[in-house]
């Protein structure tokens, strides 16, 4: 396809104010040397982080650190934000043409980026499932932070998208015990689909070597302190944005020598930082998606035109989703 045939405009989703989003037209440049034009097939709404952006709740002190790789605008808005996009290279270097790719790009129907920003989706990974690459990457980074060992007892608190991903990867480890813990009994259905034991917080087993906390709640983090064993470690994978969290650190926290360590996907985990790049981590993540068990996280679909309404429904709690997929028009339907 020649540059003359390419549309002069693209359409992207922007957060334009607190709890307000819209689709906006913008110019689409021709790709330069080392760049590719990507036509989007699917994108995914990363509910936790994207709703923080939707609510204009990104703390000013971390606004720069929380920028997405291809974000435009700045927090609180207007801002073009998102990072789960899968598409097809329509124009670019010869060895990239026609390739299905993942990109940490906002919700947009076509975009031009350096090919260094793209990750090839391997054979055996459907494009729709490949949307999960960025979230699997977060889980991979958390496991690299924690370094689970043979025979460990592990709990994952919070059976949402990130917690479920962590449990999915851990289920292949030779652990003595793994529990996925959540207040919502309906999450047992997800645990069953993943082949992981499920527990209500009151019934979760204590004396864990590692607890991954992914519930983004004060109660979940407090429960983590109760479940982790002496001198054990809590890997905090939640982002609380502008919310304050209180913890009972005056009880036995010091006597038991417990540790709470943050894991954030913006940088490769310290244990692998000198030997793995962000690109290596993404390639690891997308290869893991050959396992069809990950389809359990794809819980709904809206069209690109419906994206603003879908975000509002997720915000209002009227749309229950782990990863809500946005489906883009095919080339044929846009002619």
Question: Locations of the language-model features?
Answer:
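Helix N-cap at the beta1-alpha1 junction of Rossmann-like dinucleotide-binding domains, i.e.
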Residues: 184-187, 218, 241
């Amino acid at each position: 396809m020649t540059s003359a045939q390419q549309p002069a405009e693209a359409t992207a989703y922007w957060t334009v104010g607190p709890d307000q989003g819209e689709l906006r037209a913008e110019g689409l440049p021709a790709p330069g040397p080392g760049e590719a034009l990507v036509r989007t097939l699917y994108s995914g709404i990363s509910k936790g982080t994207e709703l923080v952006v939707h609510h204009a709740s990104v703390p000013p002190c971390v606004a720069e650190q929380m920028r997405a790789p291809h974000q435009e605008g700045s927090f609180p808005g207007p801002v073009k934000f998102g990072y789960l996009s899968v598409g097809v290279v329509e124009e670019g270097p010869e060895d990239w043409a026609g390739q299905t790719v993942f990109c940490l790009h906002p919700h947009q129907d076509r975009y031009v980026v350096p090919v260094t920003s793209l990750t090839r989706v391997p054979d055996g990974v459907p494009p729709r499932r490949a949307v999960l690459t960025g979230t699997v990457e977060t889980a991979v980074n958390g496991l690299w932070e924690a370094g689970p060992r043979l025979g460990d007892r592990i709990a994952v608190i919070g059976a949402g998208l990130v917690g479920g991903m962590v449990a999915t990867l851990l289920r292949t480890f030779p652990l003595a015990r793994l529990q996925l813990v959540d207040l919502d009994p309906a999450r047992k259905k997800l645990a069953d689909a993943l082949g992981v034991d499920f527990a209500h917080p009151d019934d979760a087993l204590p004396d864990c070597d590692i607890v991954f906390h992914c519930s983004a709640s004060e109660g979940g983090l407090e429960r983590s302190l109760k479940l982790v064993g002496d001198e054990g470690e809590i890997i905090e994978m939640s982002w609380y944005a502008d919310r304050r969290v209180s913890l009972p650190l005056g009880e036995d926290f010091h006597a038991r020598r417990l540790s709470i360590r943050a894991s954030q996907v913006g940088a490769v985990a310290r244990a692998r930082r000198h030997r793995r790049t962000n690109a290596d981590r993404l390639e690891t993540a997308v290869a893991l998606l050959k396992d069809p068990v990950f389809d359990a996280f794809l819980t709904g679909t809206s069209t690109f035109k419906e994206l603003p309404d879908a975000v509002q429904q997720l915000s209002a709690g009227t749309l229950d989703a782990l990863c809500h997929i946005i489906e883009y028009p095919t080339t044929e339907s846009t002619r």
